[in-house]
Amino acid sequence: MSTLPPSKMNFSNMNQSIASEGCIITNASISNSIVGVRTTIESGASLNGVICMGADYYETEEQKKLNEEKRLPNLGIGKGAIIKGAIIDKNACIGEGCRIGIDNMSREDGNYGHYHIVNGIIVIPKNTVLYPGTVI
């Protein structure tokens, strides 16, 4: 078992939420949510009613550079992503500007590839990559 530093929250707002150790949250708005260990939430992101399981590791600068070259999102929640009423499993990469569950529409249960609907709740499985601008 490793010991992680306390979460680092820069210019962020948390309301009725909790963040586990090792999170890095920058200029984000989080309400009625649980943020798991080592979660990175980038600038302008908004979470409401979200359970985010976190990550098993931190990405290195080399990994982030490789992601940029391949146009892949980094581990965690990308810039400007808006997520409502969802469960995000470990090691998910949610790209910049993604919109998840923001329309409040009823969804039919099922497996939709990069996500599932279970009892009307959007579930992003472990290790999923959602590219920038994805709308669910």
Name each model feature, range by range.
Residues 1-136:
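Left-handed beta-helix
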